[in-house]
Amino acid sequence: MLASLLMLVVLGSSLGADPGAEAGFWLDVPFVRQDKNLCGAASVSMILQYWHNASPTGGSIEVPSFPDIAEGLRSSESKGVFGSQMKAYLASLRYQVFVFKGQWEDVKNHISKGRPLVVGLGNRGALDHYVVVTGWNDPENVVLVNDPAQRKLLKLDRKNFQKSWEQTACWTLLALPPSLPVAAPTSDGR
């Protein structure tokens, strides 16, 4: 049941045990459009809704509304949401939260295990931006993201994604529900 709820869709023709051998994956993560400067809150909402839908107990994981999430994350110190606030908010809901400097192999590893990631993208001097990575497609050399400022399943050129991600020191957040036992990622995020 969990496998069908995760709705992993293979984008390529091969599916191997090694995430590096696959042509691509996509996770059906619900989309939430952001209000001004609330990409972090929208990203948290997407992650919470994803795990709510994927829960084997029929959605027993409670999902706060987007306005409640935004209120819980709003900062008087910044025009947006700090990554540390997202981590603390998810932890307050008893999620297992890991923030780490990601690498491309981390994206492939976690997505192939049914775990969407929130990543920070640099914006050339403007405010940084959070998106939810939902997949990748090697033949097209793209990363699939839910961009709360734009739309679901936005295709980003992998090279441009990497450059933008590096502007935030490859900031990555993995949030797992309390019902999912998991060991902490290693120092390289796995």
Task: State each model region's role.
Residues 26-54:
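N-terminal targeting signals for Sec/Tat export/insertion, comprising classic cleavable signal peptides
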Residues 54-60:
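Phosphate-handling active-site elements
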